[in-house]
Every structure is written in structure tokens, then in C-alpha cells.
């Protein structure tokens, strides 16, 4: 929450909170893992062969690793606002997987236009202050 807009999240404070939580996050992220598992199940219905997948709000990387397993030929880009979350994500990846890690904001993706083939996001959008901007960014990079 910011002073100028009580409904807008302060990204600096959000980043700090996730930086602090990163080392113990997996111990309590049961809902996130269950929702992620269900999202991945739904991908069975999607017939697509992506070359590059963006995991937007990747957290500790469980979704990124599962995407790399499912789409063996694809590169997976794990993006999170908190560097410490990405440090944890690196620990989950398999050494032979084509995973990359980028610290960035979903509302201002540090990616080129039309650079990804799929966007995956698990319980991250509630941390965004401007959903219209988020979906504009997703559309831009797809």
C-alpha cells in the first residue's frame, strides 16, 4: 500500500518481504504447490510446443522445474521480483534443464516483444497493483 493510493502495493516493501521469506518459503507454501500442480495438469489439454516459457512470479522455482520436465525442448525463464527466491529456485533446477533466472517485475517485463511462447503464473497476480498493465505485458511478450 502506498500513501498516494491505498490500494497500490509498494513494490519495494513487497520485494523486501519476499527476500526475507525465501529461505523458509517452501516449508509453508502448500497452497502454492497444490495450485501449481493443478495448473500443470491443465496443460495436458493444451497442444503447444513452446520454445521459451516465462514463469512469471516463479518464486522458489517448483513450477519452472515442472515446466522444464514437461516441455523438454523448451527453455524456461523463471522471473521473480525477489532475488532470494531465485537463489532458492536455482537449487530446485536439474543441471541439464534449460532454465534461466531473471529478477524483475511482472508489471514491467525485462523481455523483448514477442520473445516467449507461453506465460505461466501461479498465484502471483495478487501481488500486482495494475492487472491491466500485467496483461498488456504478457500480450506484448507473447
Regions found by a protein language model. Give the residues of each.
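N-terminal, positively charged/glycine-rich alpha-helical extensions of SAM-dependent methyltransferases
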Residues: 1-24
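A short acidic, Gly/Pro-enriched loop at the edge of an enzyme's catalytic core
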Residues: 107-118
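Class I SAM-dependent methyltransferase SAM/SAH-binding core
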Residues: 52-109, 133
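A short SAM/SAH-binding and catalytic strip from SAM-dependent methyltransferases
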Residues: 117-132
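A short glycine-rich, Lys/Arg-flanked "PGG" loop and its adjoining helix->strand segment in the class I
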Residues: 132-142
Amino acid at each position: 500500500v502506498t500513501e498516494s493510493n491505498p490500494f497500490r502495493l509498494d513494490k519495494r516493501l513487497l520485494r523486501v518481504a519476499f527476500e526475507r521469506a525465501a529461505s523458509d518459503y517452501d516449508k509453508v507454501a502448500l497452497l502454492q504447490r497444490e495450485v501449481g500442480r493443478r495448473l500443470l495438469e491443465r496443460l495436458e489439454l493444451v497442444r503447444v510446443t513452446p520454445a521459451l516459457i516465462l514463469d512469471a512470479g516463479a518464486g522458489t522455482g517448483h513450477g519452472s522445474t515442472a515446466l522444464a520436465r514437461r516441455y523438454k525442448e523448451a527453455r524456461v525463464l523463471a522471473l521473480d521480483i525477489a532475488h532470494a527466491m531465485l537463489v532458492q529456485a536455482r537449487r530446485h533446477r536439474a543441471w541439464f534443464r534449460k532454465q534461466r533466472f531473471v529478477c524483475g517485475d511482472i508489471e514491467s517485463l525485462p523481455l523483448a516483444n514477442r520473445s516467449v511462447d507461453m506465460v505461466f503464473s501461479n498465484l502471483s497476480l495478487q501481488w500486482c497493483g495494475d492487472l491491466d498493465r500485467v496483461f498488456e505485458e504478457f500480450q506484448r511478450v507473447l
